[in-house]
Amino acid sequence: MTTGSALYIPPYKADDQDVVVELNNRFGPDAFTAQATRTGMPVLWVARAKLVEVLTFLRNLPKPYVMLYDLHGVDERLRTKRQGLPSGADFTVFYHLLSIERNSDVMIKVALSESDLSVPTVTGIWPNASWYEREVWDMFGIDFPGHPHLTRIMMPPTWEGHPLRKDFPARATEFDPFSLNLAKQQLEEEAARFRPEDWGMKRSGTNEDYMFLNLGPNHPSAHGAFRIILQLDGEEIVDCVPDIGYHHRGAEKMAERQSWHSFIPYTDRIDYLGGVMNNLPYVLSVEKLAGIKVPDRVDTIRIMMAEFFRITSHLLFLGTYIQDVGAMTPVFFTFTDRQRAYKVIEAITGFRLHPAWYRIGGVAHDLPNGWERLVKEFIDWMPKRLDEYQKAALDNSILKGRTIGVAAYNTKEALEWGVTGAGLRSTGCDFDLRKARPYSGYENFEFEVPLAANGDAYDRCIVRVEEMRQSLKIIEQCMRNMPAGPYKADHPLTTPPPKERTLQHIETLITHFLQVSWGPVMPANESFQMIEATKGINSYYLTSDGGTMSYRTRIRTPSFPHLQQIPSVIKGEMVADLIAYLGSIDFVMADVDR
């Protein structure tokens, strides 16, 4: 199934004000305060007392905002450029909503005072609000009355304080030296003990006693430091509780202590298999703040390298997924093919997994001599390899038996849980940002959006394999139609600046020195950019207070909601089905935990 048989999605229109008119007609214009931003969507402040009513209205419109795309907070207490903020806004909770049928977004914000950090839960409107609200409580200490289980999610249960508050230290040197004596070790071990009653689970049923099984956090099929506790009746999964946070490194906190430029390498480590794909939403969002329009050559280079990393990520997924269901050989072949891709990536960027190669206003350097030959060798090689994987593995009756009909969900369920990427398109929903909301010039390329219909573990795999074929088509078009021109924008905030801007007189040299050492000064505003990353939609929501560092960096990753969905999908299936399901999600814990 391809784009021709799917639901019509209208052309994207940034800052679409239709929903603002509908809200004003329903609640009156005095109920909202608009904030001018560079996020590309309406941003509206609403009183806390009206919040649930407003969000319910948006969820139930004729063309509803079916997805709670993101929910998080901001500590506004140290913000100096407060234009657009309500008076007394010490903290903000924001709700980013997405409508497929409108192909538009809206952001609703609530201002909170430090003395009253509480906002009603919206888990009754969107089930995926649960983990987001837990993270906001964990990071900021904001309470959500009515939440079914408001506990730590990123930090350990014994942690003290809320790390994303501005008064919480950002460097290890600001803490006392860490020590772990026997008593503290026993305390931590006891805190990690799973108690079924805490999660509303019974230890026994009418005629049976349930077994509780820890899968992870170091199980090979958990794909990283991920723990999931299973409530079992024999081999059948009665219920389960995913437990995340073991890979949390405080990436959003780090962004507050790095310059706009020096944070780029940290983005590589979010989805550590995505390479420059991680750089892209960040630099695009910074460029919105700066007002930078990059040359066509930069756009095309960025697209080509992003699609290379889509292929390398999908190849690793394919090999490990097939290995999870019992076939041991294909993973060695997929890793060999990844090496061929990395040969090209390393020749162009100088690095393999984590190039940190995109720059604010361009890329680190121009394409090397002979790059076309390397790219052509790869795109000539890969199609026949994908054909072999199809015949040898994906058409295999055992693999089909293990995955067809397993862990299936439909489009409605996917949207309610915030599922994006191949997981959403495997249900038949044709929503790929490269087509629906083109960025970086994707509208100039010819490619199809692979779809499936059943939303099961097999379809998720098939969609990704077809996506690799489409990525090869895009790379070939980049190779054949690479524009001439500079690899950096001629803009004062391009970082590092073009050398021509530095060699005019002493002032330009000083400007260059300050911009490289301290970092560029970005205008005070807010910006946002989402992209179709390897594992789904990835986005950066940046807040600048007019300085050399981000005031707040919100990183929304696709894998976080994908893991939250697990219990709703896998209940009633077997443990072996869970292994196939986990493999079909395609996640890494760095992408979940940040």
UniProtKB/Swiss-Prot annotation:
PROSITE patterns: COMPLEX1_49K
Keywords of this entry: Cell inner membrane, Cell membrane, Membrane, Multifunctional enzyme, NAD, Quinone, Translocase, Transport, Ubiquinone
Membrane topology: Peripheral membrane protein
MF (Gene Ontology): NAD binding; NADH dehydrogenase (ubiquinone) activity; NADH:ubiquinone reductase (non-electrogenic) activity; quinone binding
Key word Glycoprotein present: no
Gene Ontology annotations for the cellular component aspect, listed alphabetically: NADH dehydrogenase complex; plasma membrane
Main location: membrane
Segments of this protein annotated with the region NADH dehydrogenase I subunit C: 1-185
Enzyme class label: translocase
Record's subcellular location: Cell inner membrane
Reactions accelerated catalytically: a quinone + NADH + 5 H(+)(in) = a quinol + NAD(+) + 4 H(+)(out)
Catalytic activity, EC: 7.1.1.-
Residue ranges of the region described as NADH dehydrogenase I subunit D: 209-594
Function of the molecule: NDH-1 shuttles electrons from NADH, via FMN and iron-sulfur (Fe-S) centers, to quinones in the respiratory chain. The immediate electron acceptor for the enzyme in this species is believed to be ubiquinone. Couples the redox reaction to proton translocation (for every two electrons transferred, four hydrogen ions are translocated across the cytoplasmic membrane), and thus conserves the redox energy in a proton gradient.
Alphabetized HAMAP family for the sequence: NDH1_NuoC (MF_01357), NDH1_NuoCD_1 (MF_01359), NDH1_NuoD (MF_01358)
Family statement: In the N-terminal section; belongs to the complex I 30 kDa subunit family.
Name recorded for this polypeptide: NADH-quinone oxidoreductase subunit C/D
Species name: Pseudomonas fluorescens (strain SBW25)
